[in-house]
Structures are given as C-alpha cells and as structure tokens.
Amino acid sequence: MKKILICILSLLGLTTACGQKGFEETDVKGFAELIAGENVVVLDVRTAAEFDEAHLAGALNIDVKQGDFVEQAKASLPTDKTIAVYCRSGRRSASACEKLAAEGFRVVNLKGGILAWMDAEMPTTAE
C-alpha cells in the first residue's frame, strides 16, 4: 500500500513540475515598469497587419505563427537582455515565451496582451 501511495504522489509531483512555465508573467503595471527600465527589448508577436494598427513604442515585430519564428528571434534578439513579450490577448505571447525560454532567453509575458494594455489607457503608436 505504501508503494502505491508513493507512486501516486510521485506522479502528481511530475505532472505539476511538467506544467510549470519557463517564463514569468506580469500585469500591465508590472510590464510598464519592466519596459521603462534598461536592458529590456519589447517584442510584439502578432501579425504585421496587427502591429501596423497599434503597438508599443519601440517594439520589434516577429510573428509567432511564422514557421521560422525561433530562427528570426535568435537572429534579432539579444540574449543578454530581458525580452518583454506581448500579443493581442496573451495566448500567442505565452506560446512565444515558451519557445524563447527553451532557447535560453529570459522572457516576461504581458497578461491580457495589448488589449489589457489599451484597457488601462497605456500609450500605443501606429508609427
């Protein structure tokens, strides 16, 4: 009976460990504080059309849905800076964060994406 209980608890521990993210997430306030600092690159992982409509000032755009996303990111992003990642609602940026974290980047995801950012009346640009 003890062995069965130990096996069950071990499996629960493994599934919990596998579900952990390899990146941080933050809300709009934390994201704003992060990108105001130095050693941060802001990355918008939406499509080019979405980026052209509105984005955070100074953001780079690499579409996470492109097959060569990781290769583009490795060619464009510094490994010695934090990458602050966002998309429309947070789902694509979470996917991008997983991919980038697996490549050794330090990444932070904006919970709620640019929608949350704009709901908080934070600045965007179309330039």
Go through the PLM ranges and name each one.
Residues 86:
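Short, surface-exposed ligand- or partner-binding patches at beta-edge/loop junctions that are enriched
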Residues 42-44:
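Structural scaffold elements adjacent to functional motifs in cytosolic proteins
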Residues 2-5, 12-40, 49-82, 91-127:
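Rhodanese-like catalytic fold shared by cysteine-dependent sulfurtransferases
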